[in-house]
Amino acid sequence: MHHALIVARIARSPAQDIAGVFAASDPGELRHLVGVTQRSLFQFGDVYMHFIEAGAGPGPRIAKVTGHPEFVDISRKLEAYVSPYDPQTWRSPRDAMGRCFYHWERD
């Protein structure tokens, strides 16, 4: 399994509003295009963390679907709740992905 962690800033709105955006989207086509098998959303203060598990590295697949109507719709809806962690360096979704520097998995 491959993982990705997307990090951003979260507004002071209910986290359930963000969860609702993904709950409405997850039955659709987009998760299949990206290969998402699991999604978890976390909040720590004003930090939003979006953990994705996928069969293959999701980063390149996300980059390929940024123009897909479902991706555009989700992005538009999330603008009210989520903003780039560092707006000065954000250019694409890839800029919001954390870099894994340690991973352990049991045998």
Swiss-Prot record:
Residue ranges of coiled coil: none
UniProt cross-references to InterPro entries, sorted A to Z: Dimeric_a/b-barrel, Polyketide_synth_cyclase, Polyketide_synth_cyclase_sf
Gene3D superfamilies hit by this protein: Dimeric alpha+beta barrel
Keyword tags: Antibiotic biosynthesis
Pfam families cross-referenced by the UniProt entry: Cyclase_polyket
Gene Ontology BP, a term: antibiotic biosynthetic process
Record has Disulfide bond as a keyword: no
Annotated metabolic or biological route of this protein: Antibiotic biosynthesis; curamycin biosynthesis
Protein name: Polyketide synthase CurG
Species of provenance: Streptomyces cyaneus
Gene encoding the protein: curG
